[in-house]
Amino acid sequence: MAPKAAAGKKPAEKKPVEEKKAEEVPAEKKPKAGKKLPKDAGRPDKKKKRAKKSIETYKIYIFKVLKQVHPDIGISSKSMGIMNSFINDIFEKLAQESSRLARYNKKPTITSREIQTAVRLVLPGELAKHAVSEGTKAVTKFTSS
């Protein structure tokens, strides 16, 4: 059954497609002074490049120390990776030990004293003595500046 048409009413006139689009889409906004549009704003079809994840390593510092000690010697990337892992491992052990010491003494803060004691416990003999002296020197330099 066909729908009943109201007597005397004319069907709504259709507007051309172009006029409809012009009414629906607001005029383009001009960028405010001082603000820049992203580079890809004009090209929506291109994919955005992913930002590189920054990976923190000790590679540059290892290299600087190597050049201070032996300026004529290089280091392979595999060896550099091993050294980086070694430093991360030692720092983790020191952090765990200093955390444990702070907990034993019921202190909420890890101070230079806990770090120093952790160094003495984690590192063996002569290495611990050198590390403590260098650490004390660094803390003194930091507090004086």
Curated annotation (Swiss-Prot):
Subunit record text: The nucleosome is a histone octamer containing two molecules each of H2A, H2B, H3 and H4 assembled in one H3-H4 heterotetramer and two H2A-H2B heterodimers. The octamer wraps approximately 147 bp of DNA.
Tissue: In anthers, floral buds, pollen, petals and fruits.
Localisation per UniProt entry: Nucleus; Chromosome
Keyword DNA-binding appears in the UniProt entry: yes
Keyword DNA-binding in record: yes
Molecular-function annotations in GO: DNA binding; protein heterodimerization activity; structural constituent of chromatin
Disulfide bridge map: none
Identification of the protein by name: Histone H2B
PROSITE patterns: HISTONE_H2B (PS00357)
SUPFAM superfamilies hit by this protein: Histone-fold
Species the sequence originates in: Capsicum annuum
Alphabetically ordered keywords of this record: Acetylation, Chromosome, DNA-binding, Isopeptide bond, Nucleosome core, Nucleus, Ubl conjugation
Post-translational modification (record): Can be acetylated to form H2BK6ac, H2BK33ac and H2BK34ac. Monoubiquitinated to form H2BK143ub1; may give a specific tag for epigenetic transcriptional activation.
Modified residues (N6-acetyllysine): K9, K35, K36
Residue numbers spanned by region Disordered: 1-52
PANTHER family referenced in this protein's UniProt entry, alphabetically: HISTONE H2B
Summary of the function given for this chain in its UniProt record: Core component of nucleosome. Nucleosomes wrap and compact DNA into chromatin, limiting DNA accessibility to the cellular machineries which require DNA as a template. Histones thereby play a central role in transcription regulation, DNA repair, DNA replication and chromosomal stability. DNA accessibility is regulated via a complex set of post-translational modifications of histones, also called histone code, and nucleosome remodeling.
Recorded GO CC terms: nucleosome; nucleus
